[in-house]
Amino acid sequence: MTTTLRPTEPLQQPADGGRSRTYDICVNSRRVGSVRVATDPDFGAASGRIERLRVDEPDRGRGRGTVAALAAEEVLRGWGCSEVQISVPADAVPALGLARALGYTERSRNMLKELADGTPAPPSGIGVRSMTEEEYAAWETRARDSFARSWIDRGVPEEQARAKAAASHRDLLPEGLATPGTAIHVVVHDGRVVGHVWTGVRELEPGVSAGYVYDIEVAAEQRGRGYGRALMLLAERVTREAGETLLGLHVFAGNTPAIRLYESLGYRTTHVNSSKPLL
C-alpha cells in the first residue's frame, strides 16, 4: 500500500510572502487523515511548520503518520525551507515518540496553570511596582535582543531569530507600556531594579482566553532569593484582576531552574515544541 499526500485546496500565498496548504493523507487514494503545512510568519519563509497532522483511528499504528510527516517535510523542502517546527500536545505520547524517532529536538514548551481564588501576595520585604517609561525604553531593546539570543542559542539562524523577536514585540507592544491589556512590573532590592515580569492576555484557542507571562527575568546575581517566585505570584494576581482564570507561559528547553519553579507553582506542560533541520 502507498501512502501519499493529496492537496485539498490551492496553495495559499498571502501578501506577507508566506505559504500554506492542507492535504489529505491517502492510502491507495483512500483518505485516512489530514495534515497542514505552512511557513512560519514570524521566523520567515525559510522556517516551515507541520500542523494538525491527524490519522483516523482505524489506520493508526500502521506507519501512516510517519510517512505523512516525511512527505510534509518534503513539501517544505520544495518551498525552500531549511527547518521544520512542530508543536505536540504533552499528553500525545505516541506523537511525541514519533517526533523523537524522526529526529526532532525539543526547543521549548508551553505551560498552563488554573488559578485559584485568593492568589497569595508576594513575600514581605520584596518590593514590586509598575515599570516606568524611562525604564521601558532601555528594557525593550534588551528584552528583544535577549529573546532573539535564546532562539539563536537553540540553532535558529540569527536573521530568523531577530525577525521573530522584532515581530513579537511589534505585535504585542504596539503602544509600549500603554498597550491595552499589557502590564510590566519590576522587583526592587535596595532601591535597584533586579527583575521584571511582562504579562498580558491572549487567546489560547478560539473562545478561550488566558493571562500570559510573555517575559520574566531576574538579574543573575540576585537569583535564588525568591524574586522569581514573587514575580510569578504577582503575574497571577494581575491576571485574576483582569478577570482571567488561566495563566500560560512559554519556556525554553534546558532552562531547568525556571521549569522547576513553574512546576512547583502548579503549572503543567500543555505542548512540547520541537524542530528539525531540513538537510
What are these regions (language model features)?
Residues T2-N28, R36, E159-V188:
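Active-site rim helix/loop that mediates acceptor-substrate recognition in acyltransferases
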Residues T66, A90-S108, R229, A253-H271:
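Conserved active-site alpha-helix within GNAT-family acetyltransferase domains
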Residues Y23, N28, T105, R109-E135, ...:
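C-terminal "cap" of GNAT-fold acetyltransferases
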Residues I50-R62, V88-A90, Y214-R223:
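A short, internal acetyl-CoA/4′-phosphopantetheine-binding micro-motif in the GNAT/acyltransferase core
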